[in-house]
């Protein structure tokens, strides 16, 4: 998320001007690069960037159609299947519709675009429409890789370079962790917890950091913790116990939770689950969904305004079929949930959940490599 800050915190001043002059509520078309799927995990970066942009929009802007890039619009570029999976991931991350830049240069015959991109999109259209309609009014839930709204106005030093004001250099840890099933919701209005790295902490004042720790669970990596120590802010927390693993745990006098972990994604399956347990502890055990067994997948729970779980999307981030996913669900409802597995081109499957305390454990069917499916929660 080392995205440019040169345009400010958000685009709302421009949208406000449009609305004043026209009397019409604007539409949003956020972008974030990702021109081909030769390195498909790069769509995670764009999806997380879209989520942040969507969450910063004025609430009356409800038509949000990210641009899916196809530049240079040749047969050697983005794959038809990749285009469809990308569509679903961006819908999961907060888009309400989609726009495509896939013909613009028209290097290929029109029949090629029809037989490839448009034929594939047609096969996924009903699936995408059902997902968007079912999840209307809900938002992605999980952890917020935090970027301060005051970041563009920070005091910059020579260490930041001439363009320090334009780039955050923060949050790059999020992309590899997203592929390990860490549920991320950048700029969520009610995140389960806040994630910080050293660049983010350096650009925040003491008051903002203390206020965050009072109202949210905080997750830090080692370098971020060191910056807090340098500023004397670690004096506001006290060591405590927590789940097994390498994480360190602290609490504030107000009862806030702080977990110090490693953001290194080059870890074992056991370490992945220990990391999620530590993050869940920091959240006060409020993560909406957790993949319990090892999987390299993006997990996107959607939550309603009352905090109840609306759906859980899964995107397989490998080229191998995943035999199944075992997922812990926190539905926010009393009674057993009704769960339905939805997978494009397949019949819906009713899933059986088993109670584990206040949580529910469900195991899904298989999912092909680089594919997308979701669970409707009722």
Task: Go through each PLM region and give its residues.
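Glycan-processing catalytic domains of CAZymes
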Residues: 1-214, 222-270, 361
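Surface beta-strand/loop "capping" patches
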Residues: 131-151, 285-320
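Short, exposed beta-strand/loop patches in secreted or surface proteins that constitute
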Residues: 211, 247-252, 299-303, 349-355
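C-terminal beta-strand-rich structural cap/linker in extracellular carbohydrate-active enzymes
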Residues: 217, 356-378
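Catalytic cores of secreted or luminal carbohydrate-active enzymes
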Residues: 259-290
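Generic recognition of long tandem-repeat/solenoid scaffolds
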Residues: 259-261, 310-314, 358-365
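Surface-exposed beta-strand/loop patches in extracellular or lumenal glycoproteins
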Residues: 317-335
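Solvent-exposed beta-strand/loop surfaces of large extracellular or lumenal domains
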Residues: 339-360
């Amino acid at each position: 998320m080392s995205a440019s800050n040169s345009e400010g915190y958000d685009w709302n001043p421009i949208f406000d001007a449009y609305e004043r002059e026209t009397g019409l509520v604007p539409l949003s078309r956020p972008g974030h690069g990702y021109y081909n799927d030769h390195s498909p995990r790069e769509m995670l970066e764009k999806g997380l960037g879209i989520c942040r942009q969507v969450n910063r929009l004025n609430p009356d802007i409800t038509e949000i159609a990210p641009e899916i890039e196809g530049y240079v619009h040749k047969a050697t570029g983005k794959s038809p299947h990749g285009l469809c999976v990308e569509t679903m991931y961006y819908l999961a991350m907060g888009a309400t519709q989609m726009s495509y830049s896939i013909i613009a240069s028209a290097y290929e015959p029109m029949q090629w675009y029809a037989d490839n991109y448009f034929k594939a999109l047609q096969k996924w259209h009903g699936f995408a429409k059902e997902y968007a309609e079912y999840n209307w009014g809900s938002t992605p839930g999980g952890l917020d890789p935090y970027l301060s709204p005051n970041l563009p106005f920070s005091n910059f030093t020579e260490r930041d370079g001439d363009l320090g004001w334009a780039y955050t250099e923060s949050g790059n840890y999020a992309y590899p962790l997203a592929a390990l099933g860490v549920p991320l919701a950048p700029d969520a209005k009610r995140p389960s917890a806040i994630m910080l790295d050293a660049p983010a902490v350096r650009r925040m004042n003491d008051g903002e950091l203390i206020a965050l720790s009072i109202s949210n669970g905080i997750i830090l990596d080692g370098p971020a913790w060191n910056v807090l120590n340098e500023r004397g802010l670690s004096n506001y927390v006290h060591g405590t116990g927590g789940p097994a693993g390498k994480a360190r745990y602290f609490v504030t006098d107000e009862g806030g939770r702080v977990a110090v972990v490693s953001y290194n994604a080059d870890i074992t399956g056991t370490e992945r689950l220990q990391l999620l347990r530590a993050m869940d502890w920091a959240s006060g055990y409020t993560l909406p969904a957790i993949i319990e067994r090892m999987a390299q997948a993006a997990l996107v729970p959607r939550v309603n305004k009352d905090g109840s779980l609306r759906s859980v999307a899964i995107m397989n981030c490998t080229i191998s079929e995943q035999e199944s996913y075992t997922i812990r669900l926190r539905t926010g409802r009393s009674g057993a949930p009704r769960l339905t597995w939805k997978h494009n081109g397949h019949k819906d499957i009713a899933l059986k959940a088993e109670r584990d305390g206040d949580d529910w454990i469900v195991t899904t069917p298989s999912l092909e490599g680089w594919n997308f499916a979701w669970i409707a929660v009722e």
